[in-house]
C-alpha cells in the first residue's frame, strides 16, 4: 500500500494553502536573492531587482495563464468562466518566461539598464526557481510521464516517498518532473561554475546558455509527458518552441560575436554604483 503526500500544507478555515504555492514562492525568493547578490557585483542596484520582481511576477503569471488558455482554447471557449480560475491549475512555464522577458526588456529601457546584462544576472535565479518549482508539480502529482511498472521506478534507485507519490489512481507513472528538475540542476551548476571565468562570456551569453540548456532539456522531457499542449493535434507546443528557441540562440550568439562585439559579462554595467536616478 502506498501513501501519497498531502498537497495541502495547512488550512486556515476554508482557505487551503498548498505546497505547490509555497514551493513556487520559495523559488521566486531564491531567484530574487541570487539576482540581487550577482547584480551588486555587476553594478546593478538591488532596488532595480525588487522593482522588476514586483512587475515581473504578476505579469509572468498572467502570461503563463494566457499561454495555457490559448492552446487549450477548445475547452475554454466552452467554459469562459474558467479562464481566470488559475487556482484550479493550468499555467505554462514558457508563457511566463515570454511575459517575464517582455517586462524585463521594457523595464531596462525605462531604467536605462543594459538588458542583456540583466538577463544574464537573472537567468541562473530563474533556473534555480525552475529546479525547485517542479517539486510543486510533484506534490500535486502532475507533470508526469506515461504509466510504468514499480520495477521501473525501483531501478532508478529513487527514495520511497517519490515512488509512492508516483502511484496515481492505481498506476505508477514516470517521474518526468524529476528528470527536468535534475537536468536543470546540472545546467545550473555548470552556469554558476563558468559565469565568473574571465573572457568566456560576453554580455547576453549566460542567458543564452540558460535558454539553450533549458530548451534541450524541455524538448526531451516534453516528449515523455502525458499532459502536453498541442497545436494541430499532433505537434507538442513546448517541443516546437524549444526547437525554435535553440535555433534563435545559435543565430543570435553568432551574430553578436561577429557583428556586435558586446562587452564581457564580468565588465558589468559600467554604471557608477550606487547610481542616482
Curated annotation (Swiss-Prot):
It is found in: Cell membrane. One of its GO terms (biological process) is lipoprotein biosynthetic process. The keyword rRNA processing does not apply. A 1,2-diacyl-sn-glycero-3-phospho-(1'-sn-glycerol) binds at residue 134. The chain crosses the membrane at residues 15-35, 50-70, 89-109, 112-132, 174-194, 204-224, 234-254. The keyword Secreted does not apply. Its EC number is 2.5.1.145. One of its GO terms (molecular function) is phosphatidylglycerol-prolipoprotein diacylglyceryl transferase activity. Disulfide bonds: none annotated. It is an enzyme of class 2 (transferase). It is a multi-pass membrane protein. Its main location: membrane. One of its GO terms (cellular component) is plasma membrane. Belongs to the Lgt family. Catalyzes the transfer of the diacylglyceryl group from phosphatidylglycerol to the sulfhydryl group of the N-terminal cysteine of a prolipoprotein, the first step in the formation of mature lipoproteins. HAMAP family: Lgt. This is Phosphatidylglycerol--prolipoprotein diacylglyceryl transferase. It comes from Lactobacillus delbrueckii subsp. bulgaricus (strain ATCC 11842 / DSM 20081 / BCRC 10696 / JCM 1002 / NBRC 13953 / NCIMB 11778 / NCTC 12712 / WDCM 00102 / Lb 14).
Amino acid at each position: 500500500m502506498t501513501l501519497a503526500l498531502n498537497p495541502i500544507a495547512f488550512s486556515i478555515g476554508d482557505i487551503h494553502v498548498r505546497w505547490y504555492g509555497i514551493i513556487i514562492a520559495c523559488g521566486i525568493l531564491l531567484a530574487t536573492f541570487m539576482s540581487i547578490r550577482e547584480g551588486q557585483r555587476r553594478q546593478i542596484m538591488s532596488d532595480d531587482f525588487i522593482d522588476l520582481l514586483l512587475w515581473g511576477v504578476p505579469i509572468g503569471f498572467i502570461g503563463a495563464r494566457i499561454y495555457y488558455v490559448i492552446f487549450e482554447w477548445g475547452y475554454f471557449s466552452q467554459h469562459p468562466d474558467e479562464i481566470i480560475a488559475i487556482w484550479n491549475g493550468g499555467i505554462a512555464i514558457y508563457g511566463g518566461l515570454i511575459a517575464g522577458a517582455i517586462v524585463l526588456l521594457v523595464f531596462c529601457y525605462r531604467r536605462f539598464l543594459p538588458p542583456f546584462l540583466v538577463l544574464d544576472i537573472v537567468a541562473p535565479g530563474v533556473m534555480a526557481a525552475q529546479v525547485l518549482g517542479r517539486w510543486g508539480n510533484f506534490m500535486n502529482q502532475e507533470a508526469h510521464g506515461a504509466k510504468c511498472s514499480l520495477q521501473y521506478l525501483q531501478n532508478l534507485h529513487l527514495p520511497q516517498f517519490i515512488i509512492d507519490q508516483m502511484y496515481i489512481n492505481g498506476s505508477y507513472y514516470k517521474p518526468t518532473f524529476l528528470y527536468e528538475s535534475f537536468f536543470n540542476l546540472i545546467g545550473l551548476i555548470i552556469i554558476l561554475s563558468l559565469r565568473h571565468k574571465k573572457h568566456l562570456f560576453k554580455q547576453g551569453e549566460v542567458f543564452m546558455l540558460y535558454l539553450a540548456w533549458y530548451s534541450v532539456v524541455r524538448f526531451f522531457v516534453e516528449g515523455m509527458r502525458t499532459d502536453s499542449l498541442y497545436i494541430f493535434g499532433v505537434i507538442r507546443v513546448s517541443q516546437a518552441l524549444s526547437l525554435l528557441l535553440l535555433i534563435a540562440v545559435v543565430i543570435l550568439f553568432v551574430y553578436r560575436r561577429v557583428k556586435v562585439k558586446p562587452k564581457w559579462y564580468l565588465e558589468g554595467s559600467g554604471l557608477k554604483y550606487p547610481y542616482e536616478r
